[in-house]
Every structure is written in C-alpha cells, then in structure tokens.
Amino acid sequence: MFKIYTTNYCPYCKRAKELLTSLSLKFEEIDVTENTEARDEASKKAGGWMTVPMIFRDEGFIGGFDDLYKLHLQGKLKH
C-alpha cells in the first residue's frame, strides 16, 4: 500500500497519483496543503525531505515522483 503526501497545486503529485491509478495500485492520499502537522510528520519519516509528493510504500520512504517513476521503469512497483 502506498501513502502519498500531496498539495492541491503540485503537478508531480497529480502525475504520481495517475501512475499508481493506471497500474491499479492502491494508495492513500494525505493533502498537506494546509495541514502542516501532517507535512512535518511525513518530513520526519522521510529524513527531512520537504517537497511533495512524499511517497511511502509500506511505511518505507520511496522519494518523489521521479523516484516512483524509476521504480515503475524497473518493474518494481507491481508485486
């Protein structure tokens, strides 16, 4: 299961959600546009990462959209 921390104005957040949806992979989205507490919590889990999207898989931090896309190209997103 993926967890994506997003903002409503981020194009890479949209692309990450579209990629996971196109692969029929489930994800939970947490909009941190105005939720600074959730953003700070995610940033701590991600080792200080401050930009969105912040993408996690089974509580492990993946990175941003580029990192997610690299995993897709390597065939590592589908179980």
Descriptions of predicted regions:
Residues M1-E28:
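Local sequence-structure signature of Cys/Sec-based thiol-disulfide redox active-site neighborhoods
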Residues I4-T6, S43, Q74:
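C-terminal alpha-helical interaction module
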Residues P11, E37, M50, G63:
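Short alpha-helical
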Residues L23-K26, K44-K45, F61, K70-L71:
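Non-catalytic interaction surface on structured domains
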Residues V32-G48, K76:
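Thioredoxin-like thiol-disulfide oxidoreductase module
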Residues A46-F56, F65-D66:
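Structural micro-motif
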Residues R57-H79:
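Non-catalytic, surface beta->alpha helical segment in thiol-disulfide oxidoreductase systems
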